[in-house]
Swiss-Prot record:
Record-linked CDD domains: UBA_EF-Ts
Protein's name in the database: Elongation factor Ts
UniProt similarity note: Belongs to the EF-Ts family.
Stored SUPFAM superfamilies: Elongation factor Ts (EF-Ts), dimerisation domain, UBA-like
Stretch list, region Involved in Mg(2+) ion dislocation from EF-Tu: 82-85
Cellular component aspect of the GO annotation: cytoplasm
């Protein structure tokens, strides 16, 4: 890439908090690859924080339905264009009805779910289209997760924007719900440290190595520093290694051991994560209307 646009520089600045010239320098070095630029800036200690990385721009709700025996559950993300519609009773009623149908039919995927019949007789897709026509916004069934276990499934909804399901062995529903609440707050990547992807560890090792070399300390000390930071990183992203949100003096793994319980799996959804929403440019909209 021969030139780096001002818009790209601004985007990197918003995400890292670094100066304009630093952002441009790293973008040039990475040929305009913003994600690689962030990694290189972290290595050099320039990125204050990837402030915008976790920001998402999509509206909607998370809904969960669970069977009466607490062994089967489904979770859905259903998107709308605005938060106003996401709070609309027609929208929330539709979302909950779809979750109930998903629990009953356990569809293979969203397409399969769309063909299932609601109590009204209409299919999910027909009801979606009717709702779109009624409220004037696009509505999308974005994703579906099914969970089943021989133990107990606990779930937690933080408002309607974050949802978590946890499958627990040898534990109570109350404990499963507490763990789900912890997952909602602490966002672990995996259950246990052995499940952390090797690629994620290697990426962090490269960053820590680059940072440690700047200290000027002997290689033996640097190696110990890196190992310590890697272990800390693994604990931070592993559910069992995290301090329990209700009692930070103990880790989740210790709590489960005391309760003789085991987390089989968990799933965490947050509305809009991974979706980039087009920002409105009202000046351009008005000018386009004038030109027509």
């Amino acid at each position: 890439m021969s030139t780096i646009s001002a818009a790209l520089v601004m985007q990197l600045r918003e995400r890292t908090g670094a100066g304009m010239m630093e952002c441009k320098k790293f973008l040039i070095a990475t040929n305009g690859d913003i994600e690689q630029a962030i990694i290189e800036m972290r290595k050099a200690g320039q990125a204050k924080a990837d402030k915008k990385a976790d920001r998402v721009a999509a509206e909607g709700i998370i809904v969960i339905a669970r069977s009466s025996d607490e062994r089967t559950a489904v979770m859905l993300e259903i998107n709308s264009e605005t938060d106003f519609v996401a709070r609309d009773e027609n929208f929330t009623n539709f979302a909950n009805a779809v979750a109930d149908v998903a629990l009953t039919s356990l569809p293979k995927n969203i397409e399969d779910l769309s063909n299932q019949a609601l109590s009204s007789g209409a299919t999910v897709e027909q009801a979606r289209q009717e709702l779109v026509a009624k409220i004037g916004e696009n509505i999308k069934l974005r994703r579906l997760e099914k969970m089943h276990c021989d133990g107990v499934i606990g779930y937690y909804l933080h408002g309607s924007r974050i949802g978590v399901m946890v499958a627990l062995k040898n534990g109570s529903e109350a404990l499963a719900k507490d763990i789900a609440m912890h997952v909602a707050a602490s966002k672990p990547m995996v259950v246990s440290r052995d499940q952390v992807p090797a690629e994620a560890i290697e990426n962090e090792r490269e960053i820590f190595t680059a940072q440690a070399k700047e200290s000027g300390k002997p290689q033996e000390i640097i190696d110990k520093m890196i190992d310590g930071r890697i272990n800390k990183f693994i604990d931070e992203v592993s559910l069992l290694g995290q301090p329990y949100v209700k009692d930070p003096n103990i880790k989740v793994g210790q709590l489960l051991k005391e309760k003789n319980a085991e987390v089989i799996s968990f799933v965490r959804y947050e509305v809009g994560e991974g979706i980039e929403k087009k920002e409105d440019n009202f000046v351009e909209e008005v000018m386009a209307q004038v030109r027509t």
